[in-house]
């Protein structure tokens, strides 16, 4: 029973880590990265569609993203979605492809990005702690119903805490690596 709780808690924590990595991967750090556009959805034939399902996104140069839509009619929609996103990029549409030039980051912009990175990291830690609380509550319920002993409950809570500590440390490492990436000129 406790093993199931631990496995489910760890599985949820892993999902939180992958969401963190995806969110941080989509943040610009002065280099073009196709993942930057992962969270941009295009209004296409009445439904919200991710750009990577409408076009090939590549990075031919370190600071350029090239978007080649499979349907040329979607160029305007893609351009509009990029302009409305919070990326702060200006698309250049030549009628067949869209080019995004990633501007050099100023010191101030870098610091703003680092603040966002820390905020996203903190949100991930909150999610991990919430999963810990959920796991501990389930263990306490098992003890309350006399399904497990006091010692098993304490051991289970200790195991949940160890898993939590492991993923909090991983979040700290991911966030500090992203900060270094953003601050390196």
Curated annotation (Swiss-Prot):
Q: Which residues form a coiled coil?
A: none
Cite the GO molecular-function annotations of the record: ribosomal large subunit binding
Q: Which PANTHER family match?
A: MITOCHONDRIAL RIBOSOME RECYCLING FACTOR PSEUDO 1, RIBOSOME RECYCLING FACTOR
Transmembrane regions listed in the UniProt entry: none
Cellular component GO terms, alphabetically?
cytoplasm
Location (main, coarse) = cytoplasm
Which keywords are on file for this protein? Cytoplasm, Protein biosynthesis
Organism whose genome encodes this protein? Clostridium novyi (strain NT)
Quick one: a GO biological-process term for this protein?
translational termination
Protein name per its UniProtKB record: Ribosome-recycling factor
Homology family: Belongs to the RRF family.
The subcellular localization recorded is: Cytoplasm
The protein's role, per its UniProt record: Responsible for the release of ribosomes from messenger RNA at the termination of protein biosynthesis. May increase the efficiency of translation by recycling ribosomes from one round of translation to another.
- What gene makes this protein? frr
């Amino acid at each position: 029973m406790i093993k199931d709780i631990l496995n489910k808690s760890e599985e949820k924590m892993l999902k939180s880590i992958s969401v963190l990595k995806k969110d941080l991967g989509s943040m610009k750090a002065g280099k073009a990265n196709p993942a930057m556009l992962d969270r941009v959805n295009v209004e296409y034939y009445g439904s919200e569609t991710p750009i990577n399902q409408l076009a090939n996104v590549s990075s031919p140069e370190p600071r350029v993203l090239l978007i080649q839509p499979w349907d040329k009619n979607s160029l305007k929609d893609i351009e509009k979605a990029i302009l409305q996103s919070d990326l702060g990029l200006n698309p250049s549409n030549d009628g067949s492809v869209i080019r995004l030039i990633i501007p050099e980051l100023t010191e101030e912009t870098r610091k703003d990005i680092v603040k966002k990175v820390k905020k996203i990291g903190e949100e991930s830690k909150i999610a991990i702690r919430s999963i810990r609380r959920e796991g501990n509550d389930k263990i306490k319920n098992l003890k309350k119903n006399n399904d497990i002993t006091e010692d098993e409950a304490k051991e289970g809570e200790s195991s949940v805490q160890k898993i939590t500590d492991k993923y909090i440390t991983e979040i700290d490492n991911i966030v500090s690596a992203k900060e270094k990436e953003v601050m390196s000129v």
